[in-house]
A protein has these predicted regions:
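Short His-centered aromatic/hydrophobic patch
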Residues: 90-96
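Short, well-structured alpha-helical segments in soluble
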Residues: 74-84
């Protein structure tokens, strides 16, 4: 097993949605070691082509806003288990 853990990044604020927070969160993600990050995000126009270009997995929920619901919590836990994540980051505190 690698000495580098894997982190699940949960966020509403991720490109291709425009904005400064979105760019900041993306920059955090792309600067992580290869294989160490998985992103769970909401959808935005152009997400499929954007995600295909990323050097890490991006899992999109079928919504434009992730809300702190039991279903989202279950899905995040499922993704963390499936990808062997040992840490979770939240891209922005609200609304998650």
């Amino acid at each position: 097993m690698s000495a580098v853990g894997r982190t699940l990044l949960v966020t509403n604020d991720f490109p291709p949605r425009p904005g400064g927070i979105q760019q900041f969160v993306h920059n955090l993600a792309i600067r992580q070691p290869a294989g160490s990050i998985v992103v769970y995000a909401s959808r935005w126009k152009g997400w499929e082509s954007f995600d295909a270009e990323q050097p890490f997995p991006v899992i999109r929920e079928e919504t434009s806003v992730l809300l702190p619901t039991p279903a989202v919590a279950r899905r995040a836990a499922e993704i963390a288990r499936d990808y062997g994540c040992d840490a979770v980051w939240f891209g922005a505190a609200a609304p998650l």
